[in-house]
Swiss-Prot record:
Coiled coil: none annotated. It comes from Pseudomonas syringae pv. syringae (strain B728a). The chain crosses the membrane at residues 1-21. Belongs to the TatA/E family. Residues 51-64 have a biased composition (Low complexity). Its main location: membrane. This is Sec-independent protein translocase protein TatA. Residues 41-91 are annotated as: Disordered. Part of the twin-arginine translocation (Tat) system that transports large folded proteins containing a characteristic twin-arginine motif in their signal peptide across membranes. TatA could form the protein-conducting channel of the Tat system. It is a single-pass membrane protein. GO terms for biological process: protein transport by the Tat complex.
Amino acid sequence: MGIFDWKHWIVILIVVVLVFGTKKLKGLGSDVGESIKGFRKAMNDDDKPAEQPAPQPQQAQPAPQGSPLNQPHTIDAQAHKVDEPIRKDQV
């Protein structure tokens, strides 16, 4: 039957209710339910073919010269060995 018997689950449930309270558990349950609904909706939306909007002509804008985001860069550095402290339980 595993580690937990039905009696163990009842005790765990009582402890959880005492710690968190019914109000917080109710809010948690509704949040989980909404998350599941959103997930199912997203999965169903993925199954439907997406309507392709007509492509809008875009004007090509030249990238500014010297843009740091588009330029490759290299970082020159050396690694330094760090002395690890001696653990007391290994002595």
